[in-house]
From Swiss-Prot:
Function of the molecule: Catalyzes the formation of phosphatidylethanolamine (PtdEtn) from phosphatidylserine (PtdSer).
Cofactor(s) required, per the database record: pyruvate
Name of this chain's protein: Phosphatidylserine decarboxylase proenzyme
PTMs per UniProt: Is synthesized initially as an inactive proenzyme. Formation of the active enzyme involves a self-maturation process in which the active site pyruvoyl group is generated from an internal serine residue via an autocatalytic post-translational modification. Two non-identical subunits are generated from the proenzyme in this reaction, and the pyruvate is formed at the N-terminus of the alpha chain, which is derived from the carboxyl end of the proenzyme.
Cell location: Cell membrane
Gene that this sequence comes from: psd
Top-level taxon: Bacteria
GO MF term list: phosphatidylserine decarboxylase activity
């Protein structure tokens, strides 16, 4: 079956309604039922609870509380590197931005302008720069951390579709990451500006950042923007910056001649938060 045919049902199902329902169920505190669901999830996806700060499944009051569980101290030691991997998961794609085109999968690419919600001036900063698309599976730790020190300057919420995000949809849905709902976080660093984009998906109930809290819902259907130039919000390398309540994908953009990727990286490779993502290219 072709990838386009495989994703055809996703054009037909009520993705928004399913996502709203999933968000409500995931936040519900249903006692023993919640514990049973979490226990099933841990078995189904082989979740390693020994890494969790709290490994006691029965102590989680809601599925969201379990899903966004913190790790115990020392579970992800930080590499001695200029840029750290911000998440647990797998590498979808990474490499050089071709003028303004980001490679998604064979036969598919999308523009940096589309990714950041149409802001051409912002997108131009990453012309011929570097990108990394990192996928978080259901079993993974779902908090996102800083790849390097950064000062927050902007956050942009872009409404969009809610296709599921996986290798099949990456191959079968053109412009997937620039079509789905997303939150774009813009930082300044000693290496220049960089972008961390949190991409939503079917049943991703919401996305949150440490400085704002929950961003969605609500889902107003229009682009929203927050500016932080005067608030001096600074986050250290390795510090938590956000989380998925049910998870998806992170897309990062860096300027030209900034990032030299870890030579051990390759598409589909498993990654862990805190490992070396790359070094300063200058």
């Amino acid at each position: 079956m072709s990838d386009r045919l495989a994703v055809l049902p996703q054009y037909l199902i009520p993705k928004q309604a399913l996502t709203v329902l999933a968000g409500k169920l995931a936040s519900a505190k249903a006692g023993g039922l919640t514990t049973s669901v979490i226990r099933w999830f841990v078995r189904r996806y082989n979740v390693n609870m020994t890494e969790a700060a709290n490994p006691d499944i029965a102590s989680y009051k809601s599925f969201n509380e379990f899903f966004t569980r913190p790790l115990k101290d020392g579970a992800r030691p930080a590499a001695d590197a200029d840029f750290l991997c911000p998440v647990d998961g797998a590498i979808s794609q990474y490499g050089t931005i071709d003028r303004d085109q980001i490679f998604q999968a064979k036969g598919h690419s999308y523009s940096t302008t589309a990714l950041v919600g149409g802001d051409r001036k912002l997108a131009e900063q990453f012309e011929n720069g570097s990108f990394a698309t990192l996928y978080l599976s259901p079993r993974d730790y779902h908090r996102i951390h800083m790849p390097c020190d950064g000062k927050l300057t902007r956050m942009i919420y872009v409404p969009g579709a809610l296709f599921s995000v996986n290798p099949t949809t990456a191959r079968g849905v053109p412009g997937l990451f620039a079509r789905n709902e997303r939150v774009i976080c813009v930082f300044e660093s000693e290496f220049g500006s960089f972008v961390l984009t949190l991409v939503g998906a079917t049943i991703v109930g919401s996305m949150a950042t440490v400085w704002h809290g929950t961003i969605n819902p609500p889902r107003p259907g229009v682009i929203r923007e927050w500016r932080y130039d005067e608030q001096n919000i600074r986050l250290k390398k390795g510090q938590e910056m956000g989380r998925f309540l049910l998870g998806s994908t992170v897309v990062m953009l860096f300027p030209k001649n900034t990032l030299a990727f870890n030579p051990d990286w390759s598409p589909s490779r498993a990654i862990r938060m805190g490992e070396q993502m790359g070094s300063n290219a200058n």
